[in-house]
Amino acid sequence: MTKPKIMILPDKYPCSISSILISSESMIATFNHKNILQFNHNHLDNHQRLLNNIFDEIHWTPKNLLDATQQFLQHLNIPEDIYTIYILVS
């Protein structure tokens, strides 16, 4: 199993996530605050705070940001071994 290629653009800290773009050979998916609110409305569960918070929180270090992104992928059952992940921050 290979680790996903993760790029943070621009590379600055502290930051908050503006959007996440996930790509593979067969698909591209983007997530932002509006997408997540719609996802939560359609899939109400105990973990919806995690999805909202990833875009609301300030991430102080690259490790915090990568940990939050990996939790996000796990929550959505996205296999992280075949993807390139672009994290756009502000």
Swiss-Prot record:
GO terms under cellular component: host cell cytoplasm
Keywords for this protein: Host cytoplasm, Viral RNA replication
One Pfam family it belongs to: Pneumo_M2
Membrane-spanning residues: none
Subcellular location: Host cytoplasm
InterPro entries registered for this protein in UniProt: Pneumo_M2-2
Residue stretches in coiled coil: none
Function of the protein: Mediates the regulatory switch from transcription to RNA replication. Acts late in infection by inhibiting viral transcription and up-regulating RNA replication. Inhibition of transcription by protein M2-2 requires phosphorylation of the phosphoprotein.
Family that this chain belongs to: Belongs to the orthopneumovirus M2-2 protein family.
Protein name: Protein M2-2
Native organism: Human respiratory syncytial virus B (strain B1)
Gene: M2-2
